Design a protein with these regions (language model features):
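Long, compositionally biased charged/polar accessory segments in the mid-to-C-terminal portions
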Residues: 173, 182-197
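An active-site-proximal "capping" alpha-helix that borders the catalytic cofactor pocket
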Residues: 36-53
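Post-HEXXH active-site segment of zinc metalloproteases
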Residues: 20-41
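Conserved small/polar residues in nucleotide/adenosyl-binding loops
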Residues: 199-201
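Short pre-active-site segment immediately N-terminal to the catalytic Zn-binding motif
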Residues: 1-8
Length: 201
């Protein structure tokens, strides 16, 4: 949990946002109001794909791929459920990071349905999303990363709109109601924060 989250954040901020090129004549304005969500999705997908790379174990960045699996579980759970505790019932997602997380989690869930990559389970009146195939999920993250990078590089406004509007905006009202009720009973904060320390060299 903790290690995976930190490594994901490092990959997202340092390498995710720091990678990828746009074609000549293409800029942020090409994607208009969808740019921020696409860029956050690209950085998250970079982190999600590479956190499962065995090279990170070889380099000693993570002790084992179990760290990556834990991060996959956390990401899917947050993207499909946990973050909904911050949204009023009946509202759509508006914030770029939240749209990005739902976009990614919903897209890989849908595209992996035929192979049961992520299973939606209902038990005792509660919904759970269980990852059944981590390698297949990593490949789906890679597929979506390639598409999101293409959208950004080419300034494909329609491609960005289709991804975000189809996967990142609307919330399943039944699941949303369930999430709100479950978290109200837990009495825990829907937000967590971290502080980046300043290093003087």
């Amino acid at each position: 949990g903790y290690v995976g989250g930190n490594v994901h954040t490092d990959l997202h901020e340092c390498l995710g946002h720091g990678s990828g090129k746009m074609l000549p004549g293409v800029g942020q304005e090409s994607l208009k109001n969808y740019y921020s969500t696409i860029e956050e999705a690209r950085a998250d997908l970079f982190a999600l794909y590479y956190v499962m790379d065995p090279k990170l174990v070889e380099l000693g960045v993570i002790p084992s791929l179990e760290v990556a699996k834990s991060e996959y579980c956390n990401y899917i759970r947050n993207g499909l459920m946990v973050q909904l505790t911050r949204v009023k019932l009946g509202n759509n997602l508006e914030e770029s990071h939240m749209r990005n997380r739902q976009l990614i989690a919903s897209w890989v869930y849908e595209k992996g349905k035929a192979d049961n990559v992520i299973e939606r389970v209902s038990r005792d009146g509660k919904t759970y999303f269980t990852i059944r195939d981590y390698e297949a999920l990593r490949k789906l993250f890679g597929r979506l990363l390639a598409e999101v990078q293409r959208v950004k590089s080419e300034g494909d406004f329609e491609g960005a709109r289709n991804l975000i509007e189809n996967y990142g905006v609307r919330i399943d009202p039944v699941l949303h109601q369930e999430v709100l009720e479950r978290y109200q009973k837990l009495n825990v904060a829907p937000y967590a924060g971290f502080v980046l320390s300043l290093i003087h060299i």
